[in-house]
């Protein structure tokens, strides 16, 4: 069993924010795989596709760890069964990167997960939302909606990200990393 957590902020106000690309990913994955309807729990919303649970925390981004530890306990999975999908301002828009483990890179949602589950040993799929213009505060940038051009890139990246997770689940992490870590979407 695998749990794929897409990070974002709950509510329609944030739906197309750069910070919500993790939510966009699980929505796309659900659509492609024809998963069950969303079910609501105390700290998260989930959908099931066979032995895969798609999860959206109902907490705000910086408290994502609360939702992840709750779903980890509810679904009886280890941290190695968790894949976290989130935005990365240090990665250009149009790129994705898979990592087996690592630090938070300053991402507060990811840091919250590390703090709550007590380890950084879980797979993560980073989706690029950068570069951030120098004259904009980071918090303001990630909470802005994607531009039309960025949305066209993100639309294609999300398809590739679904493919990447499919390869990861069926052919292994190493194969997915070798195929998709150098991939770049161009318009």
Swiss-Prot record:
The active site is at 19 (proton acceptor). Its main location: cytoplasm. GO terms for cellular component: cytoplasm. It catalyses: an N-acyl-L-alpha-aminoacyl-tRNA + H2O = an N-acyl-L-amino acid + a tRNA + H(+). It comes from Pseudothermotoga lettingae (strain ATCC BAA-301 / DSM 14385 / NBRC 107922 / TMO). Signal peptide: none annotated. Hydrolyzes ribosome-free peptidyl-tRNAs (with 1 or more amino acids incorporated), which drop off the ribosome during protein synthesis, or as a result of ribosome stalling. Catalyzes the release of premature peptidyl moieties from peptidyl-tRNA molecules trapped in stalled 50S ribosomal subunits, and thus maintains levels of free tRNAs and 50S ribosomes. Monomer. This is Peptidyl-tRNA hydrolase. TRNA binds at residues 14, 60, 62. It is found in: Cytoplasm.
């Amino acid at each position: 069993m695998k749990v794929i957590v897409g990070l974002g902020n709950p509510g329609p106000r944030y739906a197309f924010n750069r910070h919500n690309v993790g939510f966009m990913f699980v929505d796309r994955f659900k659509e492609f795989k024809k998963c069950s309807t969303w079910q609501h729990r105390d700290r998260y919303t989930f959908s099931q596709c066979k032995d895969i649970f798609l999860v959206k925390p109902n907490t705000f981004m910086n408290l994502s760890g609360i939702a992840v530890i709750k779903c980890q306990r509810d679904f009886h999975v280890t941290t190695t069964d968790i894949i976290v999908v989130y935005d990365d301002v240090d990665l250009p828009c149009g790129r994705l990167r898979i990592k087996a483990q690592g630090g938070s890179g300053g991402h507060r949602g990811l840091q919250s997960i590390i703090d709550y589950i007590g380890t950084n040993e879980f797979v993560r799929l980073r989706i690029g939302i950068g570069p951030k213009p120098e004259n904009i505060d980071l918090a303001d940038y990630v909470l802005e909606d994607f531009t039309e051009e960025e949305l066209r890139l993100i639309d294609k990246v999300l398809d590739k990200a679904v493919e990447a997770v499919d390869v990861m689940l069926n052919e292994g992490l190493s194969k997915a990393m070798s195929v998709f870590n150098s991939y770049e979407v161009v318009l």
